[in-house]
Design a protein with these regions (language model features):
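Small/polar-rich, solvent-exposed N-terminal microdomains that initiate assembly or binding
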Residues: 1-46, 77, 97-99
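Generic structural motif
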Residues: 26, 39-41, 65-67, 112-116
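Short, surface-exposed linear patches
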Residues: 43-45, 56-59, 81-85, 110
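Oligomerization/assembly interface segments of phage tail-like spikes and tubes
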Residues: 52-66, 103-113
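Short, conserved charged micro-motifs
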Residues: 67-73
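Acidic-leaning, charged glycine-interspersed low-complexity segments
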Residues: 73-116
């Protein structure tokens, strides 16, 4: 799934500004960036004692020193266009981290997967 997410977010831009998207941790210099991680696999579909499919959940953490609302909208849009469904009940409220000075928002998405 990570390769799909990396492909989806290759050259991700909001207002003509590149927004880096990294797995788990961002090590660059940009002050606006997104990290993502798998948080759960559940909701399995079983038949004849075999798993046929499941639901995979991913968190996307948006970090910014300024207004991030357009980024939130664009992430939701690109994820929906690629078959992911936003999970509002598993996403965070708006946060501000006093120790870093970053605004922070977590968006959770799910995608159904079928075993091959």
């Amino acid at each position: 799934m990570n390769s799909l997410i990396e492909k989806i977010f290759a050259d991700f831009k909001v207002d003509n500004k590149n927004i880096p998207v990294s797995f788990l941790k961002y090590n660059g210099q940009e002050t606006t960036y997104i990290t993502y991680q798998s948080i759960d696999n559940s909701g399995t579909l079983n038949a004849d004692d075999e798993i046929l499919g499941y639901i995979e959940y991913y968190d996307f953490d948006i970090f910014s020193k300024g207004n991030y609302l357009k980024i939130v909208r664009e992430v939701k849009k690109i994820m929906k266009a690629n078959g992911f469904m936003w999970q509002p009940s598993m996403s965070s409220g708006d946060m501000f981290e006093d120790d870093t000075g970053y605004y922070h928002k977590t968006l959770c998405f799910k995608k159904e997967r079928m075993e091959e």
